[in-house]
């Protein structure tokens, strides 16, 4: 058990209803009248929903110890996706529902972290930035540079991202997997 006064960003807790949450933001509030409390913004680990929660000062919550295993994505197999533990070489099959949030950025042979709680796979954590190849890009209109104009481009997974006008098909770019935003050209 951990006091809500000791909550930190990134900490995972288990609430009384059995749900597992990760702390995204927290704020200790001490009003002029009444008792102090902690206002938090939390992300549900199982479904990704974000919710604000308020706890009374001094309240205790159960800490959820989440195991993170380094695995390599191998290939899709029907309705499942096959991953391999990089240390033991054991293979693990995950369903589409378990990897759905990561699918737009999941590339074969990519190393990912698999989050596991009490033997239950909670989801996949991708690297923060990855290198992807643009397979199709809308043509940029010359002279249309009055502001920070972007165009649609399709990456190798079929996902569409917004890129600057100068990016063409065949180029490698870096993408932030948390937001899906273009972060720059890849110079590797």
Curated annotation (Swiss-Prot):
One of its GO terms (molecular function) is translation elongation factor activity. SMART domains: EFP (SM01185), Elong-fact-P_C (SM00841). It is found in: Cytoplasm. PROSITE patterns: EFP. Its main location: cytoplasm. Transmembrane segments: none annotated. This is Elongation factor P. GO terms for biological process: peptide biosynthetic process. Gene3D superfamilies: 2.30.30.30, Nucleic acid-binding proteins. Involved in peptide bond synthesis. Stimulates efficient translation and peptide-bond synthesis on native or reconstituted 70S ribosomes in vitro. Probably functions indirectly by altering the affinity of the ribosome for aminoacyl-tRNA, thus increasing their reactivity as acceptors for peptidyl transferase.
